[in-house]
Amino acid sequence: MSETVSHNKETRGFQSEVKQLLHLMIHSLYSNKEIFLRELISNASDASDKLRFQALSNPDLYEGNADLGVKLAFDESANTLTISDNGIGMSRDDVIEHLGTIAKSGTAEFFSKLSDDQSKDSQLIGQFGVGFYSAFIVADAVTVCTRAAGLAADEAVQWQSAGEGDYTVETITKDSRGTDIVLHMREEGKEFLNEWRLRDVISKYSDHIGIPVSIQTSVRDDEGKETGEKKWEQINKAQALWTRNKSEISEEEYQEFYKHVSHDFADPLTWSHNRVEGKNDYTSLLYIPAKAPWDMMNRDHKSGLKLYVQRVFIMDDAEQFMPSYMRFVRGLIDSNDLPLNVSREILQDNKVTQSLRNACTKRVLTMLDRMAKNDTEKYQSFWKEFGLVMKEGVAEDMANKEKVAGLLRFASTEVDSAEQTVGLASYVERMKEGQDKIYFLTADSYAAAKNSPHLEQFRAKGIEVILMFDRIDEWLMNYLTEFDGKQFQSITKAGLDLSKFEDEAEKEKQKETEEEFKSVVERTQSYLGDRVKEVRTTFKLATTPAVVVTDDFEMGTQMAKLLEAAGQAVPEVKYIFEINPEHALVKRMADEADEEVFGRWVEVLLGQAMLAERGSMEDPSQFVGAINKLLTKV
């Protein structure tokens, strides 16, 4: 390093989120402090990738030195560890933007999720990605000297901070391109001022990085004694992991490479490494994380793969190679068929891109299908984290709709649990003889679904019903209309017909009862007028006096509530009021000669049905009043 302090020094305050992150990180990640080295070496590797990419169009950026690498030197007497790279470097504005602020959307949302539980916080912070700030886990002060490739030597920058409220930035002179990070180690960080400790950490975390990582070691004579001289020794293999044969790569290497590309702290759930030659030559390495990113449902969430062309890094977060519902997938794709000067705009409408996207999508679906069949417990872990976004795939990926549908999991009346463990294939296997539809119910919650009066007839006949209570489910069922040749049927729709599961004597008895109750139905319809679409008898209830249902082509209750919650105008849902002629309360209502009291019975039964269906009612005071008036007659 050859730097001299020049001028233009200023002190600036950290963005408030940075201060909070530094505090939390130092206390939550202390037990895993060696990750600071992984993060800083990973950043140095990224800086080299970016220089290679920009030098494609401007070779002068190499400044006569295209041998890229990372070097680590420690000084026990000065208590410092220095990590140096000769990558792209940073300008003054870059330093302020990247080292003084957290340039991520949804940061406030992230911090709102933090608690006082250190293990949970460390997991969240790991998902957020700490990068450069991890230096403060082991250092009580950090100095960064950097010069962006292409800038003059006297336009270099020095950044210094003790990781508290502020930092200083000043212009310096630096002859060499790239970045030097000097860590002034805490007492607890001094273990890293040791050649063998550094060797161990580099081998563990950075073997897969595609550029040399070297440390300054002592020269020894033939007898093994130190001569007092120093030399640089490369520690890692410096071969891009995805270019190696799968048989040569250990599970631990795959796991560490995942942490490098994702900046996640946890091991991935599974991965798929493939090299394809033919119409398109490419290598893909795709990982499924164990935990969902904290901001996965955020509209601005960055997702996508790292893109390499002929082993040259092109861009991060290339979203064009994965459908949106697979935005949790991490990894990379290395293509031989895309141009080196490819841009996001070119990727958008490129046949090669579309072909690679289709291939990567199928790889992930195959991975998940294999997991679902061979490791149910692991797949359930995946579903808990990513089930909501997978449901988007039914609408988004028409080409793979049946495969995506086969991966969905739901609760059902077969399993007395809110856990979503039932696949559609297993439901179809259990269908009753003569059953040709997949029955489902949507509700606000598992409890509401499980206790819905609409289930009474199905339980009595031993017919399984899928229970859906995620907010996305009603929307999902607009697109998921059949599976394995079986149509889906909502059990809250008026067109429901279970007559095939009834014997002739039962049908005849129902017909007689329906005729007897014809006048009661007409009387109820006359009282309610156009408040309901229709009044009719039903025999699908056992312990419930009445329910409301919608026409097959009418908007369902859950969809209406979803749109209302989104602030959209929703047309009034006209319900069909179905009364159970075999229930004691309905018989009591039918026997009532006083029209005023009859009307109160109607109000109470309709109010109950609306409350069970919607969870609320427009005029609860009218409902309560009708109940009170009836109670005074008891």
UniProtKB/Swiss-Prot annotation:
PROSITE patterns: HSP90
UniProtKB keywords: ATP-binding, Chaperone, Cytoplasm, Nucleotide-binding, Stress response
GO molecular function: ATP binding; ATP hydrolysis activity; ATP-dependent protein folding chaperone; unfolded protein binding
Matches recorded under CDD domains: HATPase_Hsp90-like
Region annotated A, chain positions: 1-344
Subcellular location, principal: cytoplasm
Chain segments carrying region C: 562-634
Assembly and oligomerization: Homodimer.
NCBIfam families in UniProt: PRK05218.1
PANTHER family in the record: HEAT SHOCK PROTEIN 90 FAMILY MEMBER
Reported function: Molecular chaperone. Has ATPase activity.
Protein name from the UniProt record: Chaperone protein HtpG
